[in-house]
Amino acid sequence: MSASAREHPTTAEPAPGGAPPEPRLVPLRAAVRALLRKELGLELRAPQAVPAMALFSVTTLVVFHFALQRGQVEGDLAAGVLWVTLLFAAMLGISRLFVADHEEGGLDGFLLAPTDRTALLVAKAVGLFAFLAAVEVVAVPAFALLLLGPAPGIGTYAQLVALLLLADAGIAVIGTLIGAIAVQTRARDLIVPLMALPLLIPVVIASAKGTTPLLAEASGSGLPLRWPLLLALYDLIFGLLAYALFDYLIED
């Protein structure tokens, strides 16, 4: 036996009487790292979700550019276009979040593993958050190029990034819960928007309301603090709900 095997055994010592040893519980942090590495590695080796979401976002913005028939948009119209586009792009990522695990048996294997089920929730939510952020790196510049007039200042972009990150956290948590439910049904592509959109309405409203003054031509007031606080509260509440409910959802 190698030194590393002696230092890091995977099972406990055999019990007296020849009973089979009980597997050691994998620490939550180690399980999250392994699952997240697998999640991001799969997307890097064979990109599927991020390119599809990014292409959908850019295509939708191009459609808005020609449909609105104006050189630029501002205020609530600009905010609405941005957040509706990002929301529906997120539906693509949510609907595919658990599909590979379900079809290839990875989900069943995880349920048999000696680790906390919360590890899968955290890894999937962080992975979806990363996918959303990657899409926005493409979608937001495309939005500015196609639909905004003069480029906003650095301060405006910084405040917009803060809103995007808070909204992405809420979408990631809700998306992980809904994805875990939908993957067990045949009509998952229908179930995801029907269940996720009502739950994400507060995210869209708060994000659009916070973005409106940032994209208003004559506004110099900046981002109202109440909207980021509302998003943070939403993230906290649904994060706790996800922590409490995920075990039951994934096992059923």
Label each PLM-derived region with a short phrase.
Residues 2-9, 13-16, 235-252:
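Junction motif at the cytosolic side of a transmembrane helix
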Residues 4-50:
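Aromatic- and glycine-rich beta-strand/loop motifs that create alpha-glucan
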Residues 47-68, 83-86, 195-206, 234-241:
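Hydrophobic alpha-helical transmembrane segments of multi-pass membrane transport/permease proteins
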Residues 69-78, 141-165, 211-228:
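Membrane-interfacial helix-loop-helix connectors in multipass membrane proteins
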Residues 78-94, 98:
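Long, hydrophobic alpha-helical segments
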Residues 91-113, 125:
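Transmembrane helix boundary and interhelical loop/hinge segments in multi-pass membrane proteins
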Residues 117-144:
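Selective transmembrane-helix segments that form parts of the transport pathway or gating/packing helices
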Residues 162-197, 248-252:
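A structural motif at transmembrane helix-loop-helix junctions in multipass membrane proteins
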